[in-house]
Amino acid sequence: SADAILQNFNLIHDENPKDVLVFGADHVYRMDPMQMFQQHRETNAGITIAAIRVPRSEASEFGCIELAEDGITIKAFHEKPANPPAMPGHPDLTLISMGNYIFKRDVMEEALILDSENLESRHDIGGNIIPMLTAQGQAKVYDFANNVVPGETPRDKGYWRDVGSIDAYYDAHMDLVSVHPIFNLYNREWPVLTNLPPLPPAKFSENGTAVDSIVGAGSIIAGSRVERSVVSFDVQVQPSALIQGTVIMPGVRIGSNVIIRNAIVDKNV
């Protein structure tokens, strides 16, 4: 990841920003980055890392943060440790990196160049760049628990999922289909923006039904039943089919009498 940024650093030079935001693309959450940016500027950090609290028993799959006594300076950064450090005062919790970073531009450039010259480096932000800046005392943490998003509720506040595995990707979709979803797509004060082709509304014909499900635009549920599923746009489900606990990608055609349970169906099949 560090090498990918370095290879494209000419784009950053062209814009010449004072700070650079680097956010991971395989996570699901709702956040106001400006609040993190304000803290970054106020603390004069070389890098600010957004972090979330997770049970210590689950933290070994992530980059773990150990804080100094001031509660904001990062004392040590451990990439996927066998024994994750506990938060002060919370022995069962660990702060993990969300994969969201704000760098001072000059600090980032210097760190990337030094890392590129190290033949033993894996050229990874979490494995190499963050430990380097932590050792220099330049790394601060931003606690995601303090982020306030308009329209959020106690149920969905602080939601974050890493969807880097198939199981996690599936589970994140299932989070959307309960009566009171823990990730709320219906927050009109802070909508999740997307880009869809121009399609008509979803259509239900021949007593087709969808229960506790999301059905995308242009999809047709014809004489079939869909339960606890996410149906993307431009999907057709033929009569007498039964879909349960399934994620269906765009452009899928499901024939009559088909039964699909607890699956992910790839696009255009």
Task: Describe every region a protein language model picked out.
Residues 105-106, 110-269:
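Left-handed beta-helix
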Residues 1-176:
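Unchanged
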